[in-house]
Structures are given as structure tokens and as C-alpha cells.
Amino acid sequence: MKNRKKTVLTGGLLVAVLGCVILGFFLTGYFVGGRSGNLARGKGVIATCDSVEQESLSADMAIDGDDTTLASRWSSENNWEDASHYIQLEFPEEISVSFVVLKWERRNVVSYALEGSLDGQKWEILQKFDTAPAERHQEIVLDEAVRARFLRLSIYAVSKEESDYSNLYQNVSLYEFEVYADKPAAYLLERPVIESSKEGGRRLAMPQAPAGYQVVFIGADLEQVIGADGTVYETIQEKEVTVGYRVEDVKGREEPREVSFTIQVPAGIQTAEQEEEEERRQNACPEGVIPAVAEWCGGEGIFRLGKAPRMIVDTDSFLRESVTEGKADAQILRDMADLFNRQCESCGILQEEMTIYEGTLEDVRAGDVYLGCAEKSGGLGEEGYTCDITDKCVIKAENVTGIRWGCVTLMQLLSDGEDNTVPQGRIRDYPLYTVRGFGIDVARKPVSIETLYDMLEVMSWYKMNDFSIHLNDNTILATSGLTDSPEQAMTADSAFRLESDMRNEEGEALTSQEYAYTREEFDRFIETARIYGVTVVPEIDTPAHSLSITRLYPEYALRTSNESVDQIDLEKEEAVILVEQLWQEALAEETGAFRQARIVNIGMDEYYGEGEQYRQFLTRINDLVQGTGKAVRLWGSLSHIDGTTWPSARNLQMNIWSTVWADPREMYEAGYSLINMQNNHLYIIPGGGYDRLDIRELYENWEPNKFYDYNQMEMIPSYSPQMLGASYMIWNDMSGSLDMGISEYDLYERFREPLAVLSGKLWGASVSKPGDMDDETGDETGDETGRSGILEVPEVPFGMNGCGLYADREAAVPDYEIQMKVYLNPEASVEAGQDGKYQEQVLAQGDGAYAKWAFYAVEPQTGRVGFTREGRTYTFDYTLPRGEWVNLTLVGTSGKVTLYVDNQETDTVGSDEPFKEHATFVFPLQRVGRQTTHFEGEMELDFRNGRED
């Protein structure tokens, strides 16, 4: 979703409905009184209840107008045997009720009802609920006004879930019980309708505004179906779309509110005969595409690639709008065609190399693939595409990114089919959310540029389009054991993983000497990613997480505590200027590593210095970066860090990583664009407490616009252009003294696991039950359109795919079995020298990006069989004899490696459990035996994988 102009209407005409059904409301902006005011606050209202947790938490606390103070609420007794409770309001006279607001302290009620009575004896259920409130602020709208003198909230059951502590706290707790005679005007809004013109076009008419109000159209969740101006595009399948409006009282009697409607949008108009013919001959929607396509209209028969496959690339079609941008897009289109060809060849889809020609649609013949620009009037937007599959395959998009996604879909269809065939039909495909992301901390643990490329390629396969790279950080000082003094804290591990010219007066460099990306290779990575349809978002994190900077410039470190020295003292102007210089270097037009980045992350999380100084610093860095034409992203912290300065929301994207540091509703109402990165659902800390994502939870409960924990849930409307999407993140917190030996392959494995479910939910696909879930999770979900995904972790034909040989780096990835017959010469030097070290004997080795990568017959520190990778060495409890043949078998799995000697299990190193040493080993095959740097002997090697030899 992009920033869009909002349409305003103060009145309007209703037209005939064409397939338009209202299914529900989605409201933001709380009702604060309206014309009638809160009747529960009236004189003479009596509140009673069945029980209290303690005397001070009585029923009258629920009508005192205080909805924030914990001591000002009603709380029932904590009865584990009987969780049924009630709170009742008695009014001095009969009232009319249309609207009730319940402000829960906890959302643990799972069965309850609102009841009304004229005499307190005969009760009528006004509304009943069988699930927990969606949010702690619950609004109950009655279809018609009800006369009553008594209102009662009856609770029948309370959750017993351990995750929210309901198993311990069976009491019900309510801040406020509010009662209103009038509904907010938003609930009076007429439903929007679709109108058809004589020319055949369709559009969504603005709903009529109630008298004294104006209505603003905010947008649709599927803007490729209903555009920002109300245009209803020609879809090929019926779609359900949620649209949102803002209702504003022109006299200010009510706070502005948002209201949503769910609309069924029919496919483009067809005659009954056409529909009947389509249904008769329609191919089913192919199931091999992940995430599944948004719209499908089946044809009859199959498309088969030609024996000498050809791709026609229509570069001229991208020159129509802008010569400058068109030339750039034309080159990217050529690069995308080459990428398609290369990937198809590498994963065995094509038996022969595809020949790429420049041409037009007229040049396309049976068996060909065509790539070209679509008309802007089709509403495909930034990433949508169409794929018309007949005896040829025609892929069109308004933007080159859409072309990439069309190519990915075709690759998946071809790999799922037989003999390079695909069922004929038409695809119209597009995402639900703009940001579908993944991020990785490369600072606390180095991550090679090769692994970033592997991740990029797999992200693109799943149409994940946003790749965040966290470039600087340090060991968490609070858990480092190095905080006896500021000077000791300064010795903790830290790294800045990007080439920089910055040096202190002693000549010490900011750039990590262990491993860092050069400016040119990082710039090339950003540029290459665009060909894959992915935006790279680089991050320099300040003013916290900055020990790599304050270690060089200790005079700029915040000194409020020993643990604060990894934060920059913003009171010092010289320190702020230093950060500005760092950004100017990274953004430099000709040489900056970020010069081609469209979005950059300026950090800004977990700062414990003075709040207003922080906010002014944030605004200053934001303005500097946006001055170079780039959008800014940051870690939301404005709810937790006080101050009066609010940075402009224009082109500013906020990662909502903690609802304490940045309340999503508060940030939404402040106008910021939001990305769901909530830590308890989307953070991975390999080897630590968040070792892997909970795929079951993501499948069953999580949604990109849903922010929730054990006690709170807030929904940000998906129809709003401010709700950008979601991203998950790997944080290498287990570093320094907490290092658990996590390898790059461990990172990759955890990165890949949730991709199917997350890509499906972010693209907008219904997803199927994961293969490893039991039947208790319910049947597979999906819709009759075929928009269902696959939740198992399917094999991806790129990167560290776990299918055997990792060809790009000549290595075997887990799960593998390496069988070696090894003969160490009798005269081989294996005795320890005077320094206590042994002459290493290397059986296999490869070129590591930043450390040795080898399997030893004799490990130099111990003389035992062992291996080293990524700066960490492991040895088995076994010493290889000289002068005899020995059969060694190495079995590598996630986290562990087991050594067998002559078919007898000898030793296992490592574990796959959190907080335990990991020893995952990608076995190098680049140089084996006498090809290595030193091996005195002979060997034979046989490699087997769990699926493939």
C-alpha cells in the first residue's frame, strides 16, 4: 500500500448495489461521549456485583470515569471452581440504550452476555459472545435502541490458558462499564455500494454522510481491486475487500472515528453463457505456488515450453511513461530475464538454456514466454502482475517488480508440473501488504555476504520483498559480566560491519577488523536485490547499541551507569555531529554504501538518556536522511521515551517491536506508517529464549495487523495505507560470554522455517495446516478460489537448501553422512611440539569468509579428530592412529555432529537445544585429502544426504 490521496464527501447519492455486502465494522478512535454522554456516570446510578477480589475493587469503580488507574476497577473474586460472575447497573429511571463500551483490564472472558431488564427480574439477552474480546476496549452496538432500567454484564466462563496466566487468575476485571443512548455517527453510515457505468467501468460510490458529518475514504486492503479513487478494477474472480472511512463531526461533538465495511466484489461482468462455459472447461487453480495466487480463471489444456525455449522481452514497453526511469526499468527487465533463465537451469526446470530475445507481443509464438509492461488502468500497482497462459505464457506488470513475481510464479508452476507443462488459465496476482520482510543482525555475529545472497534468493522465491541488515551493535552489556566499571564495559564485543573511513585520533578504525562489507560489495548487493524484487534496508543503529562508536570515542559515551556506555551522550553536540558525518559518508552520492538504497533504518531503540534530547536527535537524523531523497525507517520508541518533539510522519516507517516502547494505536493515530515486528512473535534469538519462531502460533492466531500479548491486543486496520506489513528478525544476542556456537547455517535454517506461513499471510493467501501439526488444530483452511498455501517447509532449489550438495560453496549441509577411509602415514608428524601444539592434518577444507573452515584428522590444539568453522573449534574424543586404515563416519544434523569409528559410535559434539553449545557443521568439499594445505596420508570419501547421494 502506498500513500494515497483521501477522498472527502459531505453528502452523496446512493446507487443500486452490485454484489456489495456489509459484513462488519472495524473501528479506531474511541467514542468519548457523543451527544448523550455516558449514562452510567449519571446521578443515582447504582453498581452492584456478585463478588470482589478485595473491598477497594468494588463495582462502583467501574462507573467512576477512570479507565487507566489499576486501583480504579471492578475485579471479581478469584474462584477457580466457579468463574461465573456479573456486574449490574441500576438506573434511577428507564433509559434508552443503543451503545455500550466495556473497558477490560484483561481479555480473559470467553463466554459472556450483555443483558437488559425493566424490573430487575425478567432479563433479556441483548448480545451474547462466545469468544474473548478482540481488544480490551470493546464496543457493543445494538441493532435497535432498547428500553431498560437495569443492565447486567454476565460472565459464564473464563480462559484457563497458561500463556496469559488465566490458569492462575480466574477473576474478571473491568475498568469501565459505559452506557450511551446514541450510537456514534460512524455506526449510522450507509453501506458503500458499487455502481456500473454505461461504458462498462465500475466504481465504489461514497456512502452518504449523516447530517452534520463528513466522510473521508481511507482506502481498501486490496487496492488492486478497489483503487484509492474508488475505481473497481476488472478482476477475474470474485474478491472480498475491506474498505475504510473516517467519519468526522463538523461541529466537533464527537471524536473522528474510522469505520470499515467488507464488500464482495464480483469478477468482471460476464454473460451467463460465458460463466457456464468457463465453469465447464476450467482448469483447477494450481497448488504449487507459494504464496498462492490472488485470482485465477482456469482455461482448458496445457501450456508446454518449446523444445528450444524462448523468452521475448519487451523493453520498449517500459519506455512509455518516463525515458529515464524507463531505461533503468528496461535494463532491470533484461536482468530479470537472465535471472529467470539462470535459476531455471540451476534447479533443473529447463533441459536446455532459454534463448532471450528483445521483441513485442507480435513476436510471441506457441511455447514462448513474454515479459512486458501492462496498462496503468489495470490497477496492478507496484507489485501486481497478470499471467495469461494459453499456448504461450504472457506476463505483464506495471512495474518491473511485478515482472519478477510473475517469473517466480512461472518457475514454481514449471517445477510443479511435468515435462515443462503448466495448466492453461489466467492469473491476476498481487500482495495484500507492501512490506513482507525479514531482517538479520550481522553485527553481533558476522554473516558472510554469500549467506546474505542465499537468503535474498530464497526470500524472492517466496515473494518476500524487504531485507533489513542491522550493521552495528554490541554484546548486551547487562548480561556481559563486564560492568564493574565503564572501562571494563568498553571491552565488550562490538562491531561495525561496513567499510568506513572513520578513525579516532589514535588511528583506530570504526570498521570491524574481523569481517565487514566493503562499500562496493554492499552497494552491489542493494543493486542486485532489486533484480530479485527485494528492497534492502540497511541500518546504522544510534544512539543506543553504539559501543563500536563509543569505544573509539569514549568521551561521547553516556555515563549515567556502567551499562550505558554503549549509548551516545546526546547532550554533546560533537557526538551528534559525529553521527551525522557517519550518515553522510554512507549516503554519499558517488561513493556511499547506501547510495542506491530507497529506505534506510536509523535505529533509535532502547535509549535511556534524556527523552527530549533523543526526540530532537531523531528528528535531526531523520531530516538529514530524507534530505537525500530516501525514506526513513526506525525502531518505534516514542511511547516510552517522553518529550514534546514529534518527528514528521512523512516518509517515516516505524517498526513496532514492543507495544510498551511504541503503542501501535498511539503511533497509528499520530500518522506513522507501521510494520509489525512484535518481539514475542517475530523475533528469533538463535540458541536463546526465542530460538525459533512458533509456526503453530503464526498459523493459528497471528495476523500482520494484529499486535497482541498475554494481556493486550490491538488491531490496526489493513485497509489503511499506514499498515505496511510485517517482518521477522534474527538477533544474535547470544554473543560474547553467551556465545552458543551458532553458525551461519543455523541462522539460515531458522530464517527458512517460517517463510511459507508468513509469506502466505502477508501476500494475502489463505494457508493450509502445517504437515507436522496434529488434527487438533483443525482441518486445512483455504477458500474455493484456490488461494491456499502450503505450510510445510518445502524444498527451495536455491541457497543452502538442505538437499545435499551445496554447490555454490562446494559443501555438504545437514543432514548428511560422510564416510571416509583414512590412512595416516606412519611417518606423519602428529606429536605435540614444544609449544604444546600439534602439526595439523587436514582431511577437508574450504575457503571461509572470515575464519578457517576445515575437518581435521589431527586438530592442532588437541591432536584429536575435529573441525573448525566460523572461529570456533570442536574435537571428538578420538585420536587417529598412524599406519593403519580407519573407517570414519561423520553424521551431521542441526546443532550436532556424531563421529563413528569402524561403525562404532564414538562421540557426539553439540546440541540443538536452546542455551546449549551448538556444533552444526557444513562439511567442506572444496579441497579434500592431499588437495588440502597439509595431509600426510591417503583417504577415500563418500558423501550421502538424507535425500540424495
Question: Which residues does each PLM region occupy?
Answer:
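Extracellular glycan-recognition modules
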Residues: 795-866, 939, 943-949
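Feature activates predominantly on carbohydrate-active enzymes
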Residues: 378-565, 583-597
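Active-site neighborhood of glycoside hydrolase catalytic domains
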Residues: 559, 564-652, 657-664
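Acidic, contiguous N-terminal accessory segments
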Residues: 264-401, 409, 413-428, 633-641
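Aromatic, loop-rich ligand-recognition surfaces of beta-strand-rich domains
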Residues: 11-12, 29-33, 66-127, 131-184
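Short tryptophan-centered beta-strand motifs in secreted/extracellular beta-sheet-rich domains
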Residues: 467, 525, 529, 820, ...
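Short, aromatic/His-centered strand-loop micro-motif at the edge of beta-sheets
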Residues: 865-887
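Flexible glycan-contacting loops in extracellular carbohydrate-active proteins
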Residues: 908-941
